[in-house]
């Protein structure tokens, strides 16, 4: 979840009690959403559960990170693109399948305590470059890659690994789909 910003490796996996340090406009918007949820819970007793979702794969997601990689591989296989472009491949993420993410949201509604924040994410982590290499290995053609400076973030968050113990305790949720099934 972008709300935590760049964390020290000693603070991984990231717990819900970690300070919120958004490092991009997108992260600020997610942090604001989280804090508004808290405000509406405390001010108006609205049943708001604050979820902090980490990276998930979705074939219909816009051209971000993993979805962009998959789309580019498909285009290269069809001869519509010559090389795969990417940003920072050294970042580390926990990645889950969109179906696991949606099931987690449903379980949060059913079992989590209003006002509380819950991390939702994978139980394993992968370097973005390793993820890309695994995806390329599934391709039927040779794929050349190139770092595009326009895809490098000014303030990149390089380590996003959640502690999902609190969410698991409330819901018994854990990811069911593997990388290969996503």
Residue spans of the language-model regions?
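C-terminal "lid/loop" region of Rossmann-like NAD(P)-dependent oxidoreductases
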Residues: 84-88, 115-118, 126-133, 140-159, ...
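Catalytic Tyr-x(3-8)-Lys segment
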Residues: 18, 85-92, 171, 175
């Amino acid at each position: 979840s972008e709300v935590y910003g760049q964390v020290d490796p000693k603070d991984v996996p990231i717990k819900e009690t970690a300070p919120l340090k958004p490092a991009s406009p997108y992260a600020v918007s997610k942090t604001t959403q989280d804090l508004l949820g808290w405000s509406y819970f405390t001010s108006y007793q609205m049943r708001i559960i604050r979820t902090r979702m980490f990276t998930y794969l979705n074939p219909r997601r816009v051209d971000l990170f993993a979805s962009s990689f998959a789309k580019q591989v498909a285009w290269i296989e069809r001869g519509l693109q010559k090389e795969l472009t990417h940003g920072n491949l050294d970042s580390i993420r926990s990645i889950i399948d969109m179906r696991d993410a949606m099931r987690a949201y449903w379980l949060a509604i059913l079992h989590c305590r209003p006002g509380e924040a819950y991390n939702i994410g994978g139980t394993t982590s992968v370097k973005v470059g390793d993820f890309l290499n695994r995806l390329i290995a599934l391709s039927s053609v040779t794929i050349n890659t190139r770092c595009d400076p326009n895809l490098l973030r000014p303030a990149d968050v390089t380590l996003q690994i959640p502690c999902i113990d609190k969410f698991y305790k409330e819901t018994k949720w854990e990811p069911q789909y593997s990388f290969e099934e996503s």
